[in-house]
Amino acid sequence: MFTDPITITINGSAKTLARIKSTGTSSDYASSDGNYTMTVSHTMKGDRVRTLIKVGQRVVATDPLSSENDYAWLYDQRVLDRPIVGFDATTIGYLVAADNAWIVTAGVVGKLFGMES
């Protein structure tokens, strides 16, 4: 089990997320103001394990047509889908690091936002 609370850093600002729910192989975390969330869960099916890491950020957004304010959520999620045997944590870490490095390369997020593939 991860430590409680979890700290994530967004744009240089640390956000503390306390565990608010834990059931077996799944835990939910949230900041005290509810503007940041994280879910970590694991599902086994056959000879595979799927791990979900999902981070959310809530903002107040104004609808440009009606000028009404409402909450909007942004989520970043990763699914690690691995066989039970064949890969160790170090090897998985290399793949995760490569993925992270590519995503934060200059211009990649903008291209993803523009729906390039």
What are these regions (language model features)?
Residues 48-50, 60, 98-102:
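Charged, low-complexity, helix-prone segments enriched in Lys/Glu/Asp/Gln
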Residues 1-17, 109-117:
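Short, intrinsically disordered N-terminal pre-domain segments
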Residues 88-117:
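Compositionally biased, intrinsically disordered linkers/stalks adjacent to structured regions
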Residues 66-90:
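Short secondary-structure subsegments characteristic of cysteine-rich extracellular domains
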Residues 21-56:
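Amphipathic, interaction-prone secondary-structure segments
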Residues 44, 57-63, 80-84:
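Beta-strand elements of well-folded, non-transmembrane domains
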